Amino acid sequence: MKDYQIRPMAIGTVDIPKMLMTNQYGIGEVITEGVYSWYIEGPKENILIDTACRMQLLRFPVSKNVITPEQRLKDFGLKPSDIDIVIATHLMYDHIGYCALYPNAKFYAQKKEYEFAIDPHPAYKHYYDKRLFENVDFELLDGDCKIVDGVSVLFTPGHTPGTQSVLIETKVGIVGITGFCCIAQNFEPPVAMNTRDGIINIGMYYDPIEAYDNMLKLRDACDIIIPLHELEYLNVDRIPIPEITYNSRHKIR
């Protein structure tokens, strides 16, 4: 087992209707979600998961705590040119906005996602902007794939046609960063809901059944789940969190 560290790179927060995360649960509620890239700190390559949302798109009244990716990387002693690999969980505009910042990086995306993103269906068109990635020479993947020793992608479509989650080996087990947009409550529903499988489906989906099944696929593949938009990571320096003793599967941390 490798000993990677996951460093959350929060570049802002956004207030959204809760049901966009938790499929029809919490109608009328507004929550604050985190907007992130994720730096994977390891022995060799500098790896980034997603490039996050462009600042211009976050500067509206419901956005707060906005900071640039360059500033976040500086916290880790890095510059954008130091990034070797970028893994795109999917190609919606809020996850792929800063590709041009990383001139030396090799980019990975799923083939199905790329093909959809360059000519999206009208029902999903407003989530994509190919200008953000049209100059990127992606390595296009076809399903589950190892990226480097200790880091692999798990094909988890449903949120989009080509969503991929990322599995990272750490000293406490395999950490899974969801490729689909969700919060901790998707994997920790209120007891009163009495859900069959212990999950709440995501609220934004291309295929709801596929999305649900792939939530379970990811949960079964890892020991610790990082929900992609969970606000908790705004003030977390690294995962695994040193102060926590990890002794149970599927802890949301």
Where are these regions (language model features)?
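Metallo-beta-lactamase
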Residues: 67, 72-78, 82-94, 106-155, 161-238, ...
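Short, glycine/acidic-enriched loop or turn micro-motifs at the edges of active sites
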Residues: 53-54, 93, 113, 181-183, ...
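Short, conserved loop/helix-junction motifs that constitute active-site signature segments
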Residues: 100-103
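Basic, amphipathic N-terminal segments that precede the first structured/catalytic domain
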Residues: 1-29, 145, 166, 240-241, ...
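Residue-level marker for buried hydrophobic side chains located in beta-strands
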Residues: 47-49, 87, 107, 175-177, ...
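Conserved beta-strand hairpin/beta-sheet module of binuclear metal-dependent hydrolase folds
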Residues: 11-71, 165-183
